[in-house]
Every structure is written in C-alpha cells, then in structure tokens.
Amino acid sequence: MMARSLDANGAAKVYIIGRRHEKLDEVAASAVNKSIIPLQGDVSSKDSLGACAAKIAAETPFVNVVIANSGSTGPTLNGLPKDRTPSITEVYEYLWKPSMEEFNDAFTVNSSAMFYTLVAFLPLLDAGNKSPASPTISTGIKSQFIATASINGFSRKPGMGFAYTGSKAAAIHMIKTLATWMVPYDIRCNVVNPGIYPSDMSAVSIFAFHVLSIRWKDLFLRPVFSTGLNFH
C-alpha cells in the first residue's frame, strides 16, 4: 500500500525489499506509474541489507525516504483458553513451550532489522539532503526514515503476544531516541503505530473479533468504526 501510494503520487523510483520475489513482482506490476522496483532481500540480515543498499546506490545517487515496514508476531497467546482465566500451570506450560529463538525472532524483525535498515541507508539519506538533483533543495523537506510499529507498543495488555508487544515498544522508543540523535544530520525519524488494520498478519485477530461480519472496507474506512493510527 505504501509503495503503491508513493508510485501513484509521482515518486521517481520506489524500491521495495522482501524475501518473496513473486510477491514483490505482483506489487510492481500493479503500480500505476510503474516506478516500483523489486529487490529480493532479507532485512533481518546485515549482509542482505548492505547488498540491497549498495545496489540502490549504484542506480541512484540519493534517496529521500526509507520506510521500515516488516513485521513478525513471534509466539502468540491464541492457544490459551478465552472463556476463562487459565490456571498458572496452563500459563507456565504454554509460555515455556516456544523456543527462545522463536521469541527473539520478533525482536530481530521488529526492532533490530528496523534499526539496521536505517543504518544501511544513512549515506543515501544524507545524499538526499545534499544532492543538487534532490527535491529537498526545492521543497525544503528533509530526508526521512519512517518505521511501522504498533499501538500494542503502548498497551498494558499483551495483545498478539509478549514478544510482539515488547518488540514494538522497543521500536517505538528507539525511533524516539533516533529522532533526537539524528537532528544534527537533518534526517527526520518517525514511527507509525497502527491499530488493527486489514493485512495478512492481522487476519486472525480481525476474525477473532468478528470483524469479518462487516465488509472490512465499510468498517475501517468509516471514522466511527476506525481503529485509528498513532504517529510519533
């Protein structure tokens, strides 16, 4: 959705990075202005991120915005009883079952990968502020890094799970500190914290709340039913 919006609104080049090349190709093919360029890569790998940044740098002298939009749920709480308070034994056995690697995967994708995505593109973002060919010169809009976290990062309830909520809270605070730390470099850092929004990841949650009884477009595009967004 973000890539298509940038394409539709006149972005010269929109690079999208993901592990599934066929999905990237589908997005690129659907672009109105055909400015979306797919790159297969894994944002949880420094080597892969570095290779993607190097490829983009070889094709364009600068970028104006980098968006970190990947996400992972980690172990969820969906297997615990919903109609009663689970016993402490049930809680222990359920929470102890997933491996620490599964738990850490959410932090790798939602927090660490977000950070290294910014770092990988710092030289190109800096060039976006300085290149004579950059629209920054005429518009005055500085280079930007935007991350997607979650409204769950502010919640006292675990939501999709402790790994997910904790990793999103970490991402939110990291962007807050980066927003301050990047001031001398004129690189803006912001985080978007969506509520429940229709996507492959949220499909289970939407179904659980019986949202599917109403067409999602009717529900989410009407302000009275909107789950909202939070910006920082």
Question: Where in the sequence are the language-model features?
Answer:
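A conserved hydrophobic alpha-helix of the Rossmann-fold in NAD(P)-dependent oxidoreductases
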Residues: 24, 49-53, 202
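Catalytic loop of short-chain dehydrogenase/reductase
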Residues: 72, 77-107, 112-115, 119-184, ...
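C-terminal helical subdomain
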Residues: 191, 208-232
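Canonical Rossmann dinucleotide-binding motif of NAD(H)/NADP(H)-dependent dehydrogenases/reductases
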Residues: 1-15
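N-terminal Rossmann-fold cofactor-binding loop
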Residues: 17-22, 43
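Short, flexible catalytic-loop segment of classical short-chain dehydrogenase/reductase
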Residues: 193-204
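Rossmann-fold cofactor-recognition segment
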Residues: 31-47
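A glycine-rich helix->loop->beta "capping" turn
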Residues: 33-37, 54-68, 73-79, 99, ...
